[in-house]
A protein has these predicted regions:
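Active-site-proximal alpha-helix that buttresses catalytic centers in soluble enzyme cores
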Residues: 2-86, 90, 110, 122, ...
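Generic beta-sheet signal
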Residues: 3, 97-105
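Residue-level signal for well-ordered alpha-helical positions
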Residues: 62, 116-117, 140
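Short, hydrophobic/π-rich interface segment
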Residues: 104-112
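Short, flexible helix/strand-to-coil boundary loops that buttress conserved ligand/catalytic motifs
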Residues: 114-117, 151
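Domain-level recognition of soluble alpha/beta enzyme cores
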Residues: 121-148, 152-156
Length: 192
Protein backbone atom coordinates (compact mmCIF):
# COMPACT_ATOMS: atom_id res chain seq x y z
CA UNK A 1 0.00 0.00 0.00
CA UNK A 2 1.13 3.50 -0.79
CA UNK A 3 -0.02 6.37 1.39
CA UNK A 4 0.57 10.00 0.47
CA UNK A 5 0.28 12.44 3.37
CA UNK A 6 -0.16 16.04 2.25
CA UNK A 7 -0.19 19.08 4.49
CA UNK A 8 -2.60 21.63 3.03
CA UNK A 9 -0.98 24.45 1.08
CA UNK A 10 -0.40 27.84 2.68
CA UNK A 11 -3.65 29.52 3.69
CA UNK A 12 -4.67 33.04 4.57
CA UNK A 13 -4.42 34.07 8.21
CA UNK A 14 -7.60 33.94 10.26
CA UNK A 15 -7.60 37.74 10.60
CA UNK A 16 -7.57 38.05 6.77
CA UNK A 17 -10.38 35.56 6.18
CA UNK A 18 -11.99 33.43 8.89
CA UNK A 19 -12.63 30.58 6.41
CA UNK A 20 -8.85 30.44 5.78
CA UNK A 21 -8.82 29.66 2.04
CA UNK A 22 -5.51 29.16 0.29
CA UNK A 23 -3.33 32.22 -0.13
CA UNK A 24 -1.98 33.24 -3.53
CA UNK A 25 1.33 31.53 -2.64
CA UNK A 26 -0.59 28.46 -1.46
CA UNK A 27 -2.38 28.14 -4.81
CA UNK A 28 0.90 28.57 -6.71
CA UNK A 29 2.76 26.07 -4.53
CA UNK A 30 0.17 23.30 -4.66
CA UNK A 31 -0.31 23.67 -8.42
CA UNK A 32 3.45 23.35 -8.86
CA UNK A 33 3.65 20.28 -6.59
CA UNK A 34 0.60 18.64 -8.20
CA UNK A 35 1.94 19.17 -11.72
CA UNK A 36 5.32 17.77 -10.68
CA UNK A 37 3.70 14.80 -8.94
CA UNK A 38 1.79 13.99 -12.11
CA UNK A 39 4.55 14.47 -14.67
CA UNK A 40 7.68 13.35 -12.81
CA UNK A 41 6.66 11.22 -9.83
CA UNK A 42 3.82 9.51 -11.72
CA UNK A 43 1.70 9.31 -8.59
CA UNK A 44 -1.47 7.29 -9.01
CA UNK A 45 -4.08 7.39 -6.27
CA UNK A 46 -7.34 5.53 -5.85
CA UNK A 47 -8.90 8.17 -3.64
CA UNK A 48 -8.07 11.49 -2.01
CA UNK A 49 -9.43 12.14 1.49
CA UNK A 50 -9.40 15.56 3.11
CA UNK A 51 -10.65 17.24 6.26
CA UNK A 52 -13.71 19.44 6.11
CA UNK A 53 -11.64 22.62 6.32
CA UNK A 54 -11.62 24.81 3.19
CA UNK A 55 -7.82 24.94 2.87
CA UNK A 56 -7.61 21.12 2.83
CA UNK A 57 -10.50 20.85 0.37
CA UNK A 58 -8.88 23.34 -2.03
CA UNK A 59 -5.52 21.55 -1.78
CA UNK A 60 -7.16 18.17 -2.43
CA UNK A 61 -9.04 19.50 -5.46
CA UNK A 62 -5.88 20.85 -7.10
CA UNK A 63 -4.16 17.51 -6.54
CA UNK A 64 -7.19 15.65 -7.94
CA UNK A 65 -7.16 17.81 -11.08
CA UNK A 66 -3.67 16.48 -11.83
CA UNK A 67 -3.75 12.97 -10.35
CA UNK A 68 -7.29 11.93 -11.38
CA UNK A 69 -8.14 9.60 -8.47
CA UNK A 70 -10.33 6.70 -9.65
CA UNK A 71 -12.70 7.02 -6.68
CA UNK A 72 -12.60 10.81 -6.51
CA UNK A 73 -12.19 13.21 -3.62
CA UNK A 74 -14.06 12.83 -0.35
CA UNK A 75 -14.28 14.73 2.91
CA UNK A 76 -13.51 12.35 5.78
CA UNK A 77 -13.83 12.38 9.53
CA UNK A 78 -10.81 12.20 11.79
CA UNK A 79 -8.56 14.50 9.76
CA UNK A 80 -8.88 17.74 11.72
CA UNK A 81 -5.72 19.21 13.26
CA UNK A 82 -6.31 17.73 16.73
CA UNK A 83 -7.90 14.42 15.67
CA UNK A 84 -6.67 11.17 17.19
CA UNK A 85 -4.30 9.51 14.67
CA UNK A 86 -5.22 6.00 15.87
CA UNK A 87 -8.55 6.17 14.02
CA UNK A 88 -6.77 6.47 10.67
CA UNK A 89 -4.07 4.00 11.69
CA UNK A 90 -6.79 1.42 12.31
CA UNK A 91 -8.58 2.32 9.09
CA UNK A 92 -5.38 1.97 7.05
CA UNK A 93 -4.60 -1.38 8.70
CA UNK A 94 -7.91 -2.69 7.35
CA UNK A 95 -7.39 -1.29 3.83
CA UNK A 96 -6.47 -3.55 0.90
CA UNK A 97 -2.76 -3.86 0.17
CA UNK A 98 -2.95 -2.80 -3.48
CA UNK A 99 -4.66 0.53 -2.88
CA UNK A 100 -3.02 3.96 -3.07
CA UNK A 101 -4.51 6.66 -0.86
CA UNK A 102 -3.81 10.35 -0.42
CA UNK A 103 -4.76 12.18 2.77
CA UNK A 104 -4.79 15.98 2.79
CA UNK A 105 -4.80 17.36 6.30
CA UNK A 106 -3.21 19.46 8.98
CA UNK A 107 -0.58 19.54 11.67
CA UNK A 108 -0.20 18.17 14.24
CA UNK A 109 -2.47 15.33 13.02
CA UNK A 110 -0.43 14.35 9.93
CA UNK A 111 2.83 14.30 11.87
CA UNK A 112 1.22 12.22 14.61
CA UNK A 113 -0.29 9.81 12.07
CA UNK A 114 3.12 9.32 10.43
CA UNK A 115 4.70 8.71 13.85
CA UNK A 116 1.94 6.25 14.78
CA UNK A 117 2.31 4.30 11.52
CA UNK A 118 6.11 4.27 11.46
CA UNK A 119 6.87 3.67 15.15
CA UNK A 120 3.61 3.14 17.00
CA UNK A 121 4.20 6.44 18.80
CA UNK A 122 2.22 9.50 17.74
CA UNK A 123 4.62 11.87 19.49
CA UNK A 124 7.58 10.87 17.27
CA UNK A 125 8.11 13.52 14.59
CA UNK A 126 9.75 11.68 11.71
CA UNK A 127 8.92 13.91 8.75
CA UNK A 128 9.28 17.69 8.62
CA UNK A 129 5.90 18.56 7.12
CA UNK A 130 5.54 21.95 5.44
CA UNK A 131 2.62 23.55 3.65
CA UNK A 132 2.03 21.84 0.32
CA UNK A 133 4.45 18.97 0.88
CA UNK A 134 3.82 15.32 0.07
CA UNK A 135 5.27 12.54 2.23
CA UNK A 136 5.03 9.09 0.65
CA UNK A 137 4.76 6.12 3.02
CA UNK A 138 4.74 2.50 1.94
CA UNK A 139 3.41 -0.47 3.87
CA UNK A 140 5.64 -3.44 3.26
CA UNK A 141 6.28 -6.84 4.74
CA UNK A 142 4.78 -7.68 8.12
CA UNK A 143 2.60 -4.56 8.03
CA UNK A 144 5.64 -2.30 8.55
CA UNK A 145 5.56 1.23 7.20
CA UNK A 146 8.53 3.16 5.83
CA UNK A 147 9.08 6.58 4.32
CA UNK A 148 9.71 6.25 0.57
CA UNK A 149 10.23 9.93 -0.28
CA UNK A 150 9.15 13.48 0.45
CA UNK A 151 8.80 16.57 -1.73
CA UNK A 152 8.16 20.19 -0.78
CA UNK A 153 7.16 23.13 -3.00
CA UNK A 154 10.64 24.62 -2.51
CA UNK A 155 12.31 21.55 -4.04
CA UNK A 156 10.12 21.26 -7.13
CA UNK A 157 11.63 23.90 -9.47
CA UNK A 158 15.18 23.30 -8.34
CA UNK A 159 15.80 19.58 -8.42
CA UNK A 160 14.71 16.19 -9.61
CA UNK A 161 12.84 14.83 -6.59
CA UNK A 162 12.88 11.31 -7.99
CA UNK A 163 16.49 11.13 -6.79
CA UNK A 164 15.17 11.37 -3.26
CA UNK A 165 13.51 7.98 -3.63
CA UNK A 166 15.03 5.16 -1.65
CA UNK A 167 17.64 3.36 -3.66
CA UNK A 168 18.66 6.37 -5.74
CA UNK A 169 22.40 6.87 -6.13
CA UNK A 170 23.79 8.76 -3.15
CA UNK A 171 25.57 11.15 -5.52
CA UNK A 172 22.18 12.31 -6.86
CA UNK A 173 20.83 12.93 -3.37
CA UNK A 174 24.02 14.77 -2.41
CA UNK A 175 23.78 16.98 -5.51
CA UNK A 176 20.16 17.83 -4.69
CA UNK A 177 21.03 18.73 -1.12
CA UNK A 178 23.90 20.94 -2.30
CA UNK A 179 21.59 22.72 -4.78
CA UNK A 180 18.94 23.24 -2.09
CA UNK A 181 21.57 24.62 0.32
CA UNK A 182 22.86 27.04 -2.33
CA UNK A 183 19.34 28.25 -3.07
CA UNK A 184 18.59 28.73 0.63
CA UNK A 185 21.86 30.63 1.09
CA UNK A 186 21.03 32.90 -1.86
CA UNK A 187 17.54 33.58 -0.48
CA UNK A 188 19.08 34.61 2.85
CA UNK A 189 21.51 36.95 1.07
CA UNK A 190 18.65 38.45 -0.94
CA UNK A 191 16.75 39.34 2.23
CA UNK A 192 19.72 41.05 3.91
Amino acid sequence: MMLYLVQHAESKRKDEDSARPLSKKGWEDIRKVAKYAEKHLHIQVSQIYHSGKLRAQQTAQVLANHLHPARGVIVAEGLDPLANPKMWKNRLTETAEDIMIMIVGHLPHLSQLAGELLTGQANRELAAFTNGCIVCLEKGERERWKIRWMITPELVPNCDATALRLGAPIEDAQKILEEAAAIAEQRIKDTI
